[in-house]
């Protein structure tokens, strides 16, 4: 599974336009092959900070997503509303490593998230 986290800051006057754009994008992306989840959130202390979280079955599905017409259209429209560049991080998770360990596996220490 591939997880993608994108964060960006909006110009305050563009927030309503971007929320409409984001809702459209979520609907389109959730229909794509390999999309497990596609969600966006506003910052708690700054409602102009947007965090986009995506989960994809694999890298091929994510690359297909990047090549869609609606992705190109979204990025073109979004760029006019940004106060800061988009910051993106990607993570890979193997399903077997996040499931419960078998009786013969030693449990790794819990990871602390900051």
Predicted features by range, described:
Residues 2-40:
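N-terminal first-folded block
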Residues 10-12, 58, 92-95:
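Non-catalytic surface loops within mature trypsin-like serine protease
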Residues 2-8, 39-66:
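Short, well-ordered beta-strand segments in beta-rich or mixed alpha/beta enzyme
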Residues 40-46, 76-114:
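Glycine-rich beta-strand-turn "strand-cap" elements at beta-sheet edges
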């Amino acid at each position: 599974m591939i997880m993608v986290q994108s964060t960006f800051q909006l110009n305050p006057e563009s927030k309503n336009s971007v929320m409409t754009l984001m809702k459209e994008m979520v609907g389109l992306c959730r229909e794509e092959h390999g999309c497990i989840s596609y969600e966006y959130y506003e910052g708690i202390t700054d409602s102009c900070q947007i965090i986009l979280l995506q989960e994809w079955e694999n890298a091929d599905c994510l690359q297909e997503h990047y090549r869609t017409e609606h992705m190109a259209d979204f990025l073109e429209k979004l760029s006019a509303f940004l106060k800061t560049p988009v910051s993106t991080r990607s993570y890979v998770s193997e399903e077997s490593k996040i499931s419960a360990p078998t009786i013969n596996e030693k449990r790794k220490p819990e990871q602390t998230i900051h």
